[in-house]
C-alpha cells in the first residue's frame, strides 16, 4: 500500500499561528510552511486538530484555505470538517478550486453516530465531493468509530476516497484498517495519528504518519522515513 499511494509518507498537521490580538498570522504561517517544505516532509495538513480548526469562523477557515495553498509546493490537504454539511461542501469546493490535493473530513462530532448513520453521511459526501478526500477517525473527539469494515465499504464504492487518518490509540485497530481496506483498494492510504505508531504503521503495510511533532522537529520523521 505504501508504495502505491500518492499520499504516503510523513505528514505534518500544521499549527495555525496567531498574533497577539488572536487573529490569524498569515506571515507566520508562511514562514512555518516554508520550514516544513525545506525539511522535505511529504504532505501538509491544514487546519487539523492541532491547527485548531474548531476555533475559527467559517470566513477565517475559507481565508486560510485560499491563502495557504501558495505557501508550499508540497502536497496539501485541507481539513474541512464541520457539523454543518453545507459548510463542509463549501470549504471543500474552495479547497479544490485553490489547488489542494485532497480534503479531510471528520464524522459529525458532538452527535454520536451509529455505523449506519456514518455510512449514510459519508456516502452523501462521496456523491457530492468533486475531488479526492480523506476520512478522519478520532473516536475520542467524535464519540464514534469508523470501523475497518465501514471504511473498506466506502473505499470500494468511491475511487476518490483516498485514505484515512486513524487516530486511535490501538495499533491493532490501525493494522486491521490496513488489512481490510487493502483487500478492496491497493492505493488506499491508512495513516496513523499517533507519533509512536509511525514504524508499526509501515511494518503493517500502512502509508505513514500524520504527526504533530513535525511542527517542531520534522527532520526526525524525515530521517526515519529515509532509513526505513
Feature map (PLM): residue ranges:
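A general structural signal for stabilizing positions within well-ordered secondary structure
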Residues: 1, 35, 94-95, 155, ...
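Active-site beta->alpha loop and helix N-cap motifs at the rims of alpha/beta catalytic domains
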Residues: 2-145
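Catalytic alpha/beta core domains of metabolic enzymes, predominantly
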Residues: 127-128, 140-228
Amino acid at each position: 500500500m505504501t508504495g502505491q499511494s500518492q499520499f504516503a509518507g510523513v505528514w505534518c498537521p500544521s499549527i495555525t499561528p496567531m498574533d497577539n490580538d488572536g487573529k490569524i498570522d498569515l506571515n507566520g504561517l508562511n514562514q512555518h510552511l516554508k520550514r516544513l517544505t525545506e525539511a522535505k516532509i511529504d504532505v501538509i495538513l491544514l487546519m487539523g486538530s492541532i491547527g485548531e480548526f474548531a476555533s475559527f469562523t467559517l470566513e477565517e477557515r475559507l481565508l486560510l484555505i485560499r491563502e495557504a495553498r501558495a505557501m508550499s509546493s508540497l502536497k496539501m490537504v485541507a481539513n474541512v470538517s464541520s457539523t454543518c454539511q453545507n459548510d463542509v461542501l463549501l470549504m471543500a469546493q474552495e479547497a479544490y478550486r485553490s489547488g489542494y490535493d485532497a480534503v479531510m473530513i471528520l464524522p459529525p462530532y458532538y452527535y454520536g453516530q451509529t455505523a449506519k448513520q456514518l455510512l449514510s453521511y459519508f456516502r452523501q459526501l462521496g456523491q457530492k465531493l468533486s475531488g479526492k478526500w480523506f476520512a478522519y477517525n478520532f473516536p475520542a473527539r467524535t464519540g464514534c468509530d469508523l470501523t475497518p469494515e465501514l471504511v473498506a465499504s466506502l473505499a470500494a464504492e468511491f475511487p476518490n476516497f483516498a485514505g484515512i487518518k486513524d487516530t486511535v490509540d490501538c495499533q491493532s485497530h490501525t493494522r486491521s484498517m490496513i488489512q481490510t481496506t487493502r483487500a478492496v483498494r491497493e492505493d488506499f492510504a491508512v495513516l496513523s495519528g499517533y507519533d509512536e505508531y509511525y514504524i508499526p504503521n509501515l511494518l503493517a503495510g500502512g502509508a505513514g504518519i500524520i504527526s504533530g511533532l513535525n511542527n517542531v522537529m520534522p527532520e526526525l520523521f524525515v530521517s526515519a522515513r529515509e532509513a526505513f
